[in-house]
Amino acid sequence: MSGELPPNINIKEPRWDQSTFIGRAKHFFTVTDPRNILLTNEQLEAARKVVHDYRQGIIPSGLTENELWRAKYIYDSAFHPDTGEKMILIGRMSAQVPMNMTITGCMMTFYRTTPAVLFWQWINQSFNAVVNYTNRSGDAPLTVNELGTAYVSATTGAVATALGLNALTKHVSPLIGRFVPFAAVAAANCINIPLMRQRELKVGIPVTDENGNRLGESANAAKQAITQVVVSRILMAAPGMAIPPFIMNTLEKKAFLKRFPWMSAPVQVGIVGFCLVFATPLCCALFPQKSSMSVTSLEAELQARIRETYPELRRVYFNKGL
């Protein structure tokens, strides 16, 4: 065993302090790094071996702390945290930026006709379903019925919103019409995420004290967690869907895009991608992954149980999800 690296680094937790926005942002910039999708199977397996060996107390000679953390984040980017299975490539967090920039750019380029709206909103919700399935809980996996209901409902909601707003904006400024895809995505998130996590709203999510001791399950905590996720997902989409319309509205009046109109989609995809590189990790970092709420905000029955065992406890903690 090498003396260069201590055996007690907690690689189950993020490298940076998650109680601060900066710490959370650094963590998510690493988690969503698109370069991770280019890693080979050999590189992924090598990272998994480093992580598994370190957890068993086996430290390869010459391994540095930076190399250990790099292996940990490569491992986390490709393998499911509960099952340890390798995740579908497009469902990984590192695929979020390239996949979303392509889909969002196309949604915002081809939004004027009904077939285009139907196709791109369907593609977007299909991608969301893959992401939700890939990142499902290993302890309480989604059933096919739950996944199907959320998928169909979100797709229907997104298409209905987009088509309805397209009809309303036919006689207004073209710039306003460019914001229709964003409204559709926001509506879909408000439908998709609660439906995808409906079991949590029924039976609750685990709540703990600050030391991780489980206190029970709370549906009120689930409501707060899901609300935070919906807000962060909508804000995550906002820069990539709110900034490009202004830029494209100006560019399409210029000689270049008038001469080469086919360049409109690639230019828009590039602008969206630039926005998402920053918006995705920064909006994931808005709320702590380990969220908290006051004991007085819990269900009366759970409050009573907690007061019997931990009369001095004021706050409980829970995993909000992504």
Swiss-Prot record:
It holds the Pfam family SFXNs. Residues 121-146, 196-228, 288-322 are mitochondrial intermembrane. Keywords: Acetylation, Amino-acid transport, Membrane, Mitochondrion, Mitochondrion inner membrane, One-carbon metabolism, Transmembrane, Transmembrane helix, Transport. It is found in: Mitochondrion inner membrane. It catalyses: L-serine(in) = L-serine(out); L-alanine(in) = L-alanine(out); L-cysteine(in) = L-cysteine(out). One of its GO terms (molecular function) is L-alanine transmembrane transporter activity. Coiled coil: none annotated. GO terms for biological process: L-alanine transport; L-serine transport; one-carbon metabolic process; serine import into mitochondrion. It is a multi-pass membrane protein. Belongs to the sideroflexin family. PANTHER family: SIDEROFLEXIN, SIDEROFLEXIN-1. This is Sideroflexin-1. It comes from Bos taurus (Bovine).
